[in-house]
């Protein structure tokens, strides 16, 4: 009986140790596993990187910065299976489609964003949109934000350094399908409204930027909002 009990205890300790080791695995190792062809290995690594917040996203960006730089310099380059796994991991960690262009990390839980805002002293920039920021066919405005604003080096630097980023789907984006009658179909969104709110750490709206802006204009309103509405850090 004592031998059986000892064996069971040993197995339990080994199982717990394995779980703890994975949870404490260095982020660099998680970044490698995140693009594994084995989903059973990739998905837990992606979830762990996501739980690390912006630091997890930056680890992934730094690990694959050579590949990212090549695809930014050559946008017409045919995607390899490895590149598709890299972008899938980046988008899952960041919760933004084509996030390799911006390197931004978006919270999808407002309460979590508020806690980070209170701890960091940064205001929250909350994007409310139709669809999700990870969707290929999110609302037209959010697609513009991804391709023109968030990918801009000056804009992404301000967003990353001065704000806690949060996105929230208000409702699914309306879609229209055009059937050409010959087997071809075209699916497009039919509305595109979205808005950026500036929130304090209590979630109170203190500013709003509806509609679309060019990168320079958006940078100006962001800087102004960051200076005026910066909350006090809670100790």
Q: Could you describe each region identified by the protein language model?
A:
Residues 52, 124, 197:
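Ligand-binding pocket scaffold of soluble enzyme catalytic domains
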Residues 120-137, 165:
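Short active-site neighborhood of thiol/selenol oxidoreductases, capturing the structured segment around
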Residues 1-5:
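Positively charged n-region of N-terminal signal peptides that target proteins for export
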Residues 24-102, 118-119, 216-235:
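Non-globular targeting/processing and membrane-anchoring segments
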Residues 107-119, 144-207, 215, 220-225:
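Thioredoxin-like thiol-disulfide oxidoreductase module
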Residues 6-18:
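Bacterial N-terminal signal peptides
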Residues 99-104, 140-148:
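The substrate-binding groove and active-site-proximal loops of carbohydrate-active enzymes
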């Amino acid at each position: 009986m004592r031998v059986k009990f000892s064996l069971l205890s040993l197995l339990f300790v080994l199982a717990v140790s394995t779980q703890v080791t994975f949870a404490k695995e260095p982020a660099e190792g998680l970044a490698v596993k995140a693009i594994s062809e084995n989903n059973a290995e990739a998905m837990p690594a992606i979830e762990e990187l996501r739980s690390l917040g912006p630091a997890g996203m930056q680890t992934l960006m730094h690990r694959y910065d050579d590949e990212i730089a090549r695809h930014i310099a050559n946008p017409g380059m045919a995607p390899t299976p490895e590149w598709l796994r890299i972008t899938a991991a980046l988008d899952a960690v960041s919760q933004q489609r084509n996030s390799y262009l911006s390197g931004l990390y978006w919270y999808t839980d407002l309460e979590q964003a508020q806690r980070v805002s209170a701890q960091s002293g940064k205001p929250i920039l909350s994007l409310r949109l139709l669809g999700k920021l990870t969707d290929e066919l999110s609302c037209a405005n959010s697609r513009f934000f991804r391709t023109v604003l968030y990918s801009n080096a000056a804009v992404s630097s301000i967003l990353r350094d001065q704000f806690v980023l949060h996105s929230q789907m208000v409702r699914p984006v309306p879609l229209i399908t055009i059937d050409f009658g010959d087997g071809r179909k075209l699916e497009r969104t039919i509305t595109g409204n979205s808005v950026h709110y500036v929130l304090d750490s209590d979630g109170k709206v203190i500013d709003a930027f509806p509609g679309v802006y060019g990168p320079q204009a958006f940078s100006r309103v962001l800087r102004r909002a960051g200076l005026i509405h910066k909350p006090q850090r809670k100790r």
